[in-house]
Swiss-Prot record:
Compartments, as annotated in UniProt: Plastid, Chloroplast thylakoid membrane
GO cellular component, one term: chloroplast thylakoid
Record: residues binding chlorophyll a 1: 77, 83, 96, 218
Molecular-function GO terms, alphabetical: chlorophyll binding; metal ion binding; protein domain specific binding
GO BP annotations, alphabetical order: photosynthesis; photosynthesis, light harvesting in photosystem II; regulation of stomatal movement; response to abscisic acid; response to herbicide; response to high light intensity
Membrane topology annotation: Multi-pass membrane protein
Function in brief: The light-harvesting complex (LHC) functions as a light receptor, it captures and delivers excitation energy to photosystems with which it is closely associated. Modulates the rate of photosystem II (PSII) state transitions and influences PSII macrostructure. Involved in PSII excitation energy transfer and charge separation during photosynthesis in thylakoids.
Transmembrane regions listed in the UniProt entry: 150-170, 219-239
Gene source species: Arabidopsis thaliana (Mouse-ear cress)
Positions that bind chlorophyll a 3: 135, 145, 213
Gene field: LHCB3
UniProt key word Magnesium: yes
Name of this chain's protein: Chlorophyll a-b binding protein 3, chloroplastic
């Protein structure tokens, strides 16, 4: 890609990692610099290639030879050698992206009902994520967003059926790339339905968005794990746990509940 440009200039590109500033060869397809303002868009060489940021920064040991920085989110860390086999590596990349997307949606869905009920005064019968589903077995059923005019669910079988159909259609479009629906890429279908705003039209922006997606997806997966543990230990939702901690950090923290994991406690 860089060979298509006959001229380049050396610029100083600020990076967000350890406050470093490095000299690099400016390339319009690789580095996007807003010269009219102090805000810089990260160069893709910060996240891709042999000189990318590593998992321990400057203290990282030699990274495995198969982790070349070709793919987004590769920080050179694979202690267990899970990605040594190319086929396993490809499968794991796909699994991570898909699970990260589900986790981002899940984390958003876990927090939103509590936020809406507390500060927007939306009347949910049960805003806590791990308790809300049981409302479908109540006499009045389950109202989506607390509004009976949206979806008034009274049958768990009907909900599961619609879920399978809707998710199956989306996954089918994603994998098969039907004409006019997607572009045939399993992980990044694109097209007017999967990228209606054209966010991935520019290759530099697309490469940067892939990194942002995988980083936020990993964070969301850890968040969901934290929500699961909180639900088991405290029996409360994530927002209520957060507010309790902010109200009294000394009394409401992980250490205060650590004994609940001890046998016989």
């Amino acid at each position: 890609m860089a060979s298509t440009f006959t001229s380049s200039s050396s610029v100083l590109t600020p990076t967000t990692f350890l406050g470093q500033t490095k000299a690099s060869s400016f390339n319009p397809l690789r580095d996007v610099v807003s010269l009219g303002s102090p805000k810089y868009t990260m160069g893709n060489d910060l996240w891709y290639g042999p000189d990318r940021v590593k998992y321990l920064g400057p203290f990282s040991v030699q990274t495995p030879s198969y982790l070349t920085g070709e793919f987004p989110g590769d920080y050179g860390w694979d202690t267990a050698g899970l990605s040594a086999d190319p086929e396993a590596f490809a499968k794991n990349r796909a699994l991570e992206v898909i699970h990260g997307r589900w986790a981002m949606l899940g984390a958003f869905g876990c927090i939103t009902p509590e936020v809406l009920q507390k500060w927007v005064r939306v009347d949910f019968k049960e805003p806590v994520w791990f308790k809300a589903g049981s409302q479908i077995f109540s006499e009045g059923g389950l109202d989506y967003l607390g509004n009976p005019n949206l979806v008034h669910a009274q049958s768990i079988l009907a909900v599961l059926g619609f879920q399978v159909i809707l998710m199956g259609l989306v996954e089918g479009f994603r994998i098969n790339g039907l004409d006019g629906v997607g572009e045939g890429n399993d992980l990044y279908p694109g097209g007017q339905y999967f990228d209606p705003l054209g966010l991935a039209d520019d290759p530099v922006t697309f490469a940067e968005l892939k990194v942002k997606e995988i980083k936020n997806g990993r964070l969301a997966m850890f968040s969901m794990f934290g929500f699961f543990v909180q639900a088991i230990v405290t029996g409360k939702g994530p927002l209520e746990n957060l507010l309790d901690h902010l109200d009294n950090p000394v009394a409401n923290n992980a250490w205060a509940f650590a004994t609940k994991f001890a046998p016989g406690a």
